């Protein structure tokens, strides 16, 4: 059984959102409408499973913007493959991802 078969709707939606260019937790919450108590644990699981990567923003950039440093999320190669499989499995996800890319 492939990872995309085991991917929850929430995880698929978050992967699709990251794949569409939303990079930070707050942006992902805003784009999906999911609460932080759903998004952040899912991000940790996706990173643990190797589907996404994260990197902290440079302190100087955050300081210049007068806010705390943010964690930037990107799809891994495995995450891209899994997202493509999820898009085939969840037709609505395809519509959401395509709409977000426009």
Question: What is the predicted function of each stretch?
Answer:
Residues 78-102:
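Amphipathic alpha-helical dimerization/coiled-coil segments
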Residues 14-17, 42, 72, 89:
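Residue-level recognition of specific faces of alpha-helices
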Residues 49-66, 74:
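Beta-hairpin "wing" of winged helix-turn-helix
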Residues 2-40:
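N-terminal helix-turn-helix DNA-binding core of bacterial DNA-binding proteins
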Residues 69:
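Exposed loop/turn and edge beta-strand positions of beta-sandwich/beta-sheet ligand-binding modules
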Residues 20-24, 48-49, 79-81:
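Short, charged/polar surface micro-motifs in flexible loops or helix N-caps
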Residues 1, 73:
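A positively charged, amphipathic N-terminal helix/segment that binds anionic biomolecules
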Residues 39-51:
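Basic amphipathic alpha-helical segments that dock to polyanions
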């Amino acid at each position: 059984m492939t990872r995309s078969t085991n991917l929850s709707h929430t995880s698929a939606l978050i992967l699709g959102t990251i794949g569409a260019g939303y990079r930070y937790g707050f942006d992902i919450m805003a784009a999906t409408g999911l609460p932080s108590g759903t998004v952040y644990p899912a991000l940790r699981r996706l990173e643990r499973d190797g589907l996404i990567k994260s990197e902290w923003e440079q302190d100087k950039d955050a300081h210049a913007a007068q806010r705390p440093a943010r964690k930037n999320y990107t799809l891994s190669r495995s995450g891209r493959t899994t997202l493509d499989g999820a898009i085939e499995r969840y037709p609505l996800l395809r519509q959401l991802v395509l709409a977000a890319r426009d």
